[in-house]
C-alpha cells in the first residue's frame, strides 16, 4: 500500500505541481509543504467516496463471494503491479496515469480470476457505472479541462493582461478567483459528505448558501490581507503569483481527493476481508487512518522521488507563466473535484496536460509541444 501511494506521489503528484515549479510560483520544497497539508486534507475529506469506487466499481465483488481469499490476494497483486509500474515509469521519466494503472490492474486481476464476468463493464448507478465510465473519462476529462482552462485564460488575458491597467485588474480578479475556488471545494465537501453520512441532513439548497457564505468570507479576508501587501509591488506577475499559489493549494486538495483512492481502494478491500472473512459489499466504510496513510505516502513520494519528472511536464509541454499556470491548475482542480464528486476516477496528469494544451493554443499551434501530447496519449493506452 505504501509503495503504491509512494509511486503516485513521485509520478502523478509531481506532474500536478509541474506548472507551479516551472513558473517559479513555488520552489520544490515549498511544493512539498503545500502537498503535505492539502493532499492530506483532500484525502481525508473527499477520498472516501472515490476509494469505495475503485474498490468495488471495477471488479465485481459478487464473483468472489465463494472465495474471498482470491479477491484479497488479487488486490495485493493489484497494489504490487501498480506500485512497480508507477515507480519504474518515474525512473524512466515517463509520465503515466496512476488512475489508469490501478484500474487496468483491477481489470486484469478480475479477468485472470473469473473471466469477463468478474468485471463490471457497465451498471445503472448515480455515480460510477462500472469500467465503461473509466473509458468515458478519457474523453470527458480532457474536454472539461480544455474548456475550463481555455475559458479562464481567455478571460484573464482579455480583461487583465491586455487591459490599460493590468495590475489593478489583477487585484480585482484575485478575490473573484478565490471565491470561485472556495465555493467549488466547500460545496463538493458537503455533497460528498452526504454520501459518507457526515452531512446527511444538509439539502442541496442549504449546501449552496453555506458554500457561498464561506467563499465570500475567505475571499474578503484574502483581499483585506493580500491586496494592501501586493499594492507595494509594481509587477502584474507578482499579483498573479499569489493566485497561482492559491490554485496550487486547490490542485493539491483535488489530487488528494481523487488519487488517494488508487492506492487505498485495493487495500481497503484487503483490510475488510482480513477482518470479516467475507467479500465487501458496494458500500463499506473506509477507516480514516487508511486515507491518512495514503496521503502521507503520496507526499513522501513527491518529496523524495518526484524530482525525476517534476519539470518534465511544466518545462516541455507549453510556455508556463504565472497567469497560464493559474488557469491550468484551477481548471484541473475543478475537473478533478467534479469527477471526485460523482465518483469518476480520472487521471490528474492527463487532465493537467490537456488543460495546458488549451492555454498553449492561444499562442498558435506552435505554442504546444504536440509530440509530448502524443506521448501522453500513447502512455495512457500502454499503462492500461
Report each predicted region and the residues it spans.
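Alpha-helical transmembrane segments and immediately membrane-proximal extracytoplasmic
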Residues: 1-384
